Design a protein with these regions (language model features):
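C-terminal subregion of chymotrypsin/trypsin-like serine protease catalytic domains
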Residues: 41-44, 305-359
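Protease-domain processing segments flanking chymotrypsin-fold serine proteases, especially trypsin-like
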Residues: 36-153, 352-353
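Extracellular/luminal regions of secreted and cell-surface proteins that mediate adhesion/ECM remodeling
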Residues: 355-491
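Active-site-proximal beta-strands of protease catalytic cores
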Residues: 158-163, 254-266, 287-293, 300-329
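Chymotrypsin/trypsin-fold serine protease catalytic domain
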Residues: 194-197, 204-208, 212, 223-298
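C-terminal segment of classical bacterial N-terminal signal peptides
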Residues: 21-32
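Conserved catalytic-core segment of clan PA serine endopeptidases
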Residues: 109-132, 138-148, 154, 173-238
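A short beta-turn/strand-edge loop motif at beta-sheet boundaries
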Residues: 171-172, 178-180, 390-397
Length: 491
């Protein structure tokens, strides 16, 4: 049994024993989609809308620099030493393809057959399935430079993207005379649109071993291996869903319709909106899927995928990697680094390794009937989602504490409003939306606001369970619900 607990996470609360009332809750399987002790400081999470990012140019293809022994190997940073390490070889995968997980009502994409990829078109509702599985990425490097790319969720907590979005060969982004280096931090935001992240964002760090890149890219800048995994320590895919992925034979690609969704940021685009295009590949190569279009910076890492209309499943086939320009005759091409059988096996193995094999319940997405209340009000309704981030199912009676905080970090040092329980059989990588029953809805305290003006507070929950990772049993800052409490008392 191997479970990785993130040591960098802030321990925001301690488990305290309490007597909880047994109550009946309305449970609906979600269709995806004040103490004397000081409170710990809130996490230093940075809203990506505030980042000043440079364009990540879509690189032009070039020959590999020398040769690399074992280019199929995966490389990450050893958190203990800070040095690159090659991960052990992956065993044979248990499946021939990984299936997508839809977490909400299905939204159909255009299905008109085309001989080649058409023009980019703006996605009108990027917060909807299936487009919200695409994430905008900000990569921050040792020099302080920040660049933007795209990625695709292929698990509740794993993003697939281009290797050059994670490990750069641009010396200007590195320090200490290095000519190539890892990004220090990567921030991802699903369904991003015009500085709005409807599902919040997640940060990952190189020093925690969150980034995995193919050895062929790291040592030879080989575009056949321009692919990377970004592991997330929050399963944001529980709110958005995720795509499957898998390899196929050369002949399988002929005549089929494919899609690619991302965030072009080079003129005439500015990276603020999600765009998509669709069509058939013009050339099928051993390590690349190629179509005759001009690519744009910011699209790097976009997943190119196939929609199986018979099963309503989506399968990522590769990632947007590089451009190729020809002058006789003149044409531009986009090369997508292909998921080969070997790459699929490695991806599958690393996702399994990243997923706990003991249940891990994570609360998220707090909703209330209003965002403004008076002192003494009882909430009209409240619900939240609980996700089991694990490879195993778990039947569990869960005791829950509801807190009100003066900031968005929910802890046991905040004001306890109410408690309740629910029982559910959690599937692996699945969850339930909990609707608090009327008799257990929390009341806003009468003595909460001491000033002569309205004040902002945040409401959230803590799950009182001893699962595989107790650091995520409190709702995270972005999922706590902000409330405005009127200072006037209405009786």
């Amino acid at each position: 049994m191997k479970i990785t607990l993130k040591t960098r996470r802030i321990l925001r609360w301690l488990l305290a024993g309490s007597l909880f009332l047994l109550t009946t809750l309305s449970l609906t399987p979600w269709q995806p989609a004040l103490a004397q002790d000081p409170e710990p400081p809130p996490p230093q999470s940075v809203d990506p809308a505030t980042l000043e990012a440079d364009l990540e140019p879509l690189p032009a293809w070039s020959s590999p620099i020398g040769t690399t022994e074992n280019p199929e190997a995966l490389v990450t940073i050893d958190p203990a030493t800070g040095l690159n390490i090659i991960l052990p070889p992956a065993p044979p995968a248990a499946e021939s393809a990984s299936v997508s997980q839809m977490m909400d009502t299905f939204v159909q994409l255009a299905t008109g057959e085309e001989r080649a990829f058409g023009s980019l078109t703006v996605v009108p509702n990027p917060e909807d399935w299936p487009d919200r599985t695409a994430v905008k990425m900000w990569s921050e490097y040792p020099s302080g430079a920040t660049t933007v790319c795209t990625g695709i969720l292929i698990d509740s907590s794993v993003v697939l993207t281009a290797g050059h979005c994670v490990y750069t060969w641009e010396a200007s982004r590195c320090t200490g005379g290095a000519t190539k280096c890892w990004a220090d931090k990567i921030t991802v935001a699903p369904g991003w649109e015009n500085n709005n992240s409807p599902y919040g964002w997640v940060e990952s760090f190189a020093v925690s071993g969150d980034f995995i890149v193919w050895n062929g890219w790291i040592n030879s800048k080989d575009y056949d291996y321009d692919m990377a995994l970004v592991k997330l320590d929050f399963p944001i895919g529980a709110l958005t869903g995720w795509f499957g992925y898998g390899p196929n034979s050369d002949s399988w690609y002929i005549g089929r319709l494919f899609h690619s969704t991302g965030y072009p940021a080079a003129p005439p685009y500015d990276g603020s909106d999600m765009y998509t295009w669709q069509g058939s590949y013009d050339t099928i190569e051993e390590f690349a899927l190629v179509h005759e279009n001009m690519g744009y910076g910011g699209q790097s890492g976009s997943g190119t995928y196939y929609w199986n209309t018979a099963t309503d499943q989506y399968f990522v086939q590769g990632v947007h990697s590089h451009t190729r320009t020809y002058y006789s005759p003149p044409k531009d091409e986009v090369g997508n680094t292909r998921i080969t059988t070997s790459k699929f096996t490695s991806i599958y193995d690393r996702i399994q390794d990243h997923t706990p094999d003991i249940y891990d319940l994570v609360p998220m997405d707090i909703n209330t009937d209003s965002s403004t209340y008076n002192r003494g009000d009882i909430l009209g309704s409240m619900n939240y989602y609980v996700f089991n981030h694990a490879s195993v199912s778990k039947s569990k009676t869960v005791s829950v504490s509801v807190y009100l905080s003066s900031n968005d970090t929910i802890s046991i040092f905040d004001t306890l409003l109410s408690t309740h329980q629910f029982t559910w059989n959690f599937p692996a990588n699945g969850g339930v939306r909990v609707t608090v029953s009327p008799g257990d809805l929390p009341r806003i305290p009468y003595n909460l606001v001491s000033t002569d003006s309205d004040e902002d507070f945040w409401i959230g929950v803590i799950l009182n369970v001893s699962d595989s990772d107790t650091s995520d049993n409190a709702v995270r800052d972005q999922d706590a619900k902000k409330l405005t409490i009127n200072h006037t008392i209405f009786i």
